[in-house]
């Protein structure tokens, strides 16, 4: 029944799907003899989105209009500011990878190898965001793994096959989808071996993990326990072929510039050699000259470097880039805070001087773009705490004094004269 009589003979309308009355929901939409509430509509939309996303993984990889490198780059531009060369390298590498997957079934004498990617750049330069954006664009399963938590199988900690288990969880244990996903391994530089000579002692979280990752990255049948289970000998495992999973490894590689400079300066000796002091060279400029031998000297094993043929370096973000990151991307932080304040029916204005102060603070902290949110959150904490209880506030203005901790936000009230707070 879509309608019932109330105790006071008022005709109450009910949702035909969940049975809630018109007083229990925000909106009740009528059809021929049926009603549906806003909550059921939201639930239906969620179900449709989930099913479309699942179907889209196969569709996205089999249809002829796979995004071109230029289109991939344009979408990356909407979310990631700067790092132009890295975006170009990634766009080409990802396009070639999924183009290769589309032609796997075709018989051909030439077998195309997989090109995994290594991202090198300082903290907060956009490595993780680039990988996340690519996965969202291609609509494929995606997982982020932290290399510092990994240990060799048999030791306390996560073994490398846990990465594949997380990937399976992200696509509801559908093996075919997982086998075409993207894995981002962060902090890969933290598992470098302690010296560039092969170790004779057991290094369970360094060279040992690199050896374990090597098999996964180049392609192997990973044995993963069933949904929600833990590994034990007397159980059936899910077999996942990692051959077509795209692995993107990222790390800050602190100290790699010194290794590169030491190598390049050795070759720049004698008359006519270009002499440039270490201080004159930007770290990003130095990193662009990275060679496999530098990564080996840093502590990565040669076999793993060979499985990461595409190397993209990201530079340190300057003040201008950080200010752009605050306002320009689709999901920019300032846009997010505008939306939060709009929910309270209050306009938020963050002045250019305040944006500059946020950027400078992030540079001083050496946190890059990753530190921007915590700086803004700290500056806006008090006003976000008080605002729901305050009456008549129409606008909040943030200037550089608020960011630096020397002042409080300027509040404009609805009944205040127009000149209040202006200048």
From Swiss-Prot:
Keyword Chaperone carried by entry: yes
Binding locations of Zn(2+): 15, 18, 37, 40
InterPro entries hit by this protein: AAA+_ATPase, ATP-dep_Clp_protease_ClpX, ATPase_AAA_core, Clp_ATPase_C, Clp_protease_ATP-bd_su_ClpX, ClpX_bact, P-loop_NTPase, Znf_CppX_C4
Gene3D superfamilies: 1.10.8.60, ClpX chaperone, C4-type zinc finger domain, P-loop containing nucleotide triphosphate hydrolases
Region forming the signal peptide: none
GO cellular component: HslUV protease complex
Binding-site positions, ATP: 122-129
GO terms for MF: ATP binding; ATP hydrolysis activity; ATP-dependent protein folding chaperone; protein dimerization activity; unfolded protein binding; zinc ion binding
Keyword set, alphabetical order: ATP-binding, Chaperone, Metal-binding, Nucleotide-binding, Zinc
Domain of life: Bacteria
PANTHER family assigned: ATP-DEPENDENT CLP PROTEASE ATP-BINDING SUBUNIT CLPX-LIKE, MITOCHONDRIAL, ATP-DEPENDENT CLP PROTEASE ATP-BINDING SUBUNIT CLPX-LIKE, MITOCHONDRIAL-RELATED
Function comment: ATP-dependent specificity component of the Clp protease. It directs the protease to specific substrates. Can perform chaperone functions in the absence of ClpP.
Membership in a protein family: Belongs to the ClpX chaperone family.
SUBUNIT field: Component of the ClpX-ClpP complex. Forms a hexameric ring that, in the presence of ATP, binds to fourteen ClpP subunits assembled into a disk-like structure with a central cavity, resembling the structure of eukaryotic proteasomes.
Name of the featured protein: ATP-dependent Clp protease ATP-binding subunit ClpX
Organism from which the protein derives: Paraburkholderia phytofirmans (strain DSM 17436 / LMG 22146 / PsJN)
């Amino acid at each position: 029944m879509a309608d019932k009589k109330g105790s006071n003979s008022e005709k109450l309308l009910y949702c035909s799907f969940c049975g809630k009355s018109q007083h229990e929901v925000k909106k009740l939409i009528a059809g021929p003899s049926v009603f549906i509430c806003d909550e059921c509509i939201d639930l239906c939309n969620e179900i449709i989105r989930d099913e479309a996303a699942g179907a889209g993984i196969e569709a996205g990889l089999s249809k002829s209009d796979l995004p071109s490198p230029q289109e991939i780059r344009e979408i990356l531009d909407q979310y990631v500011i700067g790092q132009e060369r890295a975006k170009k390298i990634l766009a080409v590498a990802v396009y070639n990878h999924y183009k290769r997957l589309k032609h796997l079934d075709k018989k051909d004498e030439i077998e195309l190898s997989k090109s995994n990617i290594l991202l090198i750049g300082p903290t907060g330069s956009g490595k993780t965001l680039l990988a996340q954006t690519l996965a969202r664009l291609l609509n494929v399963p995606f997982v982020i793994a932290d290399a510092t938590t990994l240990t060799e199988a048999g030791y306390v900690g996560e073994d490398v096959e846990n990465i594949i288990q997380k990937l399976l969880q992200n696509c509801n244990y559908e093996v075919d989808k997982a086998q075409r996903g993207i894995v981002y391994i962060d902090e890969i530089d933290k598992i470098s071996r302690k010296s560039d000579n092969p170790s004779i002692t057991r290094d369970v979280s360094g060279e040992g993990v690199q050896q374990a990752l090597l098999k996964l990255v180049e392609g192997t049948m990973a044995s993963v326990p069933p949904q929600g289970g833990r590994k034990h000998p007397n159980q059936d495992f899910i077999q996942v072929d990692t051959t077509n999973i795209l692995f993107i490894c990222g790390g800050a590689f602190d100290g790699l510039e010194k290794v590169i400079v030491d190598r390049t300066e050795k070759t720049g000796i004698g008359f006519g050699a270009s002499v440039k002091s270490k201080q004159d060279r930007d770290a990003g400029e130095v990193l662009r000259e990275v060679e496999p031998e530098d990564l080996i000297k840093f502590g990565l094993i040669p076999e793993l470097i060979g499985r990461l043929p595409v190397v993209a370096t990201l530079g340190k973000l300057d003040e201008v880039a950080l200010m752009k990151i605050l306002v320009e991307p689709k999901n920019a932080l300032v846009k997010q805070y505008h939306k939060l304040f709009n929910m309270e029916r209050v306009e938020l204005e963050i002045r250019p001087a305040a944006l500059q102060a946020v950027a400078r603070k992030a540079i001083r902290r050496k946190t890059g773009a990753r530190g921007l949110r915590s700086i803004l959150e700290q500056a806006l904490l008090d006003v976000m705490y008080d605002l729901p209880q305050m009456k008549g506030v129409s606008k909040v203005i943030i200037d550089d004094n608020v960011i630096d901790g020397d002042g409080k936000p300027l509040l404009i009230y609805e009944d205040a004269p127009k000149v209040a707070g202006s200048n």
